Amino acid sequence: MTFIQQLEHAWAAGNTLLQVGLDPDPQRFPRELEGKPDAIFQFCREIVDATAPYACSFKPQIAYFAAHRAEDQLEALCAHIRAAHPHLPIVLDAKRGDIGTTAEHYAREAYERYGAHAMTVNPYMGLDSVEPYLGWKDRGVIVLCRTSNPGGSDLQFLKLDNGEPLYLHVAGMVADKWNADGQCGLVVGATFPNELAAVRQRIGDAMPLLVPGIGAQGGDVTATVNAGRNAAGTGMMINSSRAILYASGGDDWRQAAADAARDLRDAINGVR
């Protein structure tokens, strides 16, 4: 089963477009995990198990693990997701942007070491920075397009000679040239619903969108769903991280995360 097929199955089986982001910050962990050498793994595992009924995918951010020398805990976490929740794809958020053999090794890291089903990549160096990942025909390649951060406008909103903004040119290039085998998706932030709608119109219904920016970054659920959904009412992985992970710092942190995920899933479904 390819990444896209797995994602489509998860949308349908769980009736959900919610993606749970895994950005573990040990300073915000519950007290019961203090001093444990594998606290990052334990925290993320419990979050995964609590929120899996409401998720269509999980997105671990690699820097949150690497900064604590916890890549082995990321390996263990990905193995746990594949074993306990095999229907839910793992999107490794790494935003890699190199070329050639370096990119090939990044692909091996994501797809072999961690067993991710997809990963985020940066297209700034052109096709050379994306092509090595496309060689893994059953995996997904999620290309940065219109990111949720305000500074993204410094480059992404620049106009080409034909008047088209750069982010929309990237969307069209991925859809028309790089997605021949149906592996690609795009990252488009919830904080820019007009641009999100423009991207969906440009690429059509087939390509999934990873949509960060809901929750702590201020993206609006109604505007996001209306702008980004496809004709089937799916087509998106709407990501939330901190609002779910740290819904409570008390003893009820597992249930609080589950409740936050369920509530956001229901809010999304109330629109689509």
From Swiss-Prot:
Residue pairs linked by disulfide bridges in the UniProt entry: none
Family membership noted in the UniProt record: Belongs to the OMP decarboxylase family. Type 2 subfamily.
Gene of this entry: pyrF
Active site feature: K95
EC primary class: lyase
Organism: Bordetella petrii (strain ATCC BAA-461 / DSM 12804 / CCUG 43448)
Single annotated GO MF: orotidine-5'-phosphate decarboxylase activity
The UniProt record lists the keyword Lyase: yes
Species lineage: Bacteria, Pseudomonadati, Pseudomonadota, Betaproteobacteria, Burkholderiales
The protein, known as: Orotidine 5'-phosphate decarboxylase
EC number: 4.1.1.23
